[in-house]
UniProtKB/Swiss-Prot annotation:
Pfam families: Ribosomal_L11, Ribosomal_L11_N. Disulfide bonds: none annotated. Belongs to the universal ribosomal protein uL11 family. Keywords: Methylation, Ribonucleoprotein, Ribosomal protein, RNA-binding, rRNA-binding. The gene is rplK. This is Large ribosomal subunit protein uL11. Part of the ribosomal stalk of the 50S ribosomal subunit. Interacts with L10 and the large rRNA to form the base of the stalk. L10 forms an elongated spine to which L12 dimers bind in a sequential fashion forming a multimeric L10(L12)X complex. Gene3D superfamilies: Ribosomal protein L11, C-terminal domain (1.10.10.250), Ribosomal protein L11/L12, N-terminal domain (3.30.1550.10). The keyword Ribonucleoprotein applies. NCBIfam families: L11_bact. It comes from Vibrio vulnificus (strain CMCP6). Forms part of the ribosomal stalk which helps the ribosome interact with GTP-bound translation factors.
Amino acid sequence: MAKKVEAYIKLQVAAGMANPSPPVGPALGQRGVNIMEFCKAFNAKTESMEKGLPVPVVITVYSDRSFTFVTKTSPAAVLLKKAAGIKSGSGRPNTEKVGTVTDAQIQEIAEAKAADMTGADIEAMKRSIAGTARSMGLVVEG
């Protein structure tokens, strides 16, 4: 018989840097999950990723307090900021531009996020990411 799902917990945790401090500790502790077991498993799974990059994770907690988790790709905004080499987006994206990204960079981000996005094809995903870039105050070249 399948285990009964008790909860889904969605978090964003820095790759390779999960530890029992907030937000991980309180979110898992109130569900009775072994926090250190999650931290070790998460850090092992994300060790190949760039350290410190935020990684969305969905943790499924079962009634016997066991868990499984699925990592997603980093948010498009984070990947765009990294590609453009900026710290944050523009407060006034329509008037104040803070950086540029090329079509090739957008293609690369779309391919990386393809597994998590619901676009019909790669071109639709590229348009979506280009829209995110424009809303952050980035100029899209190409």
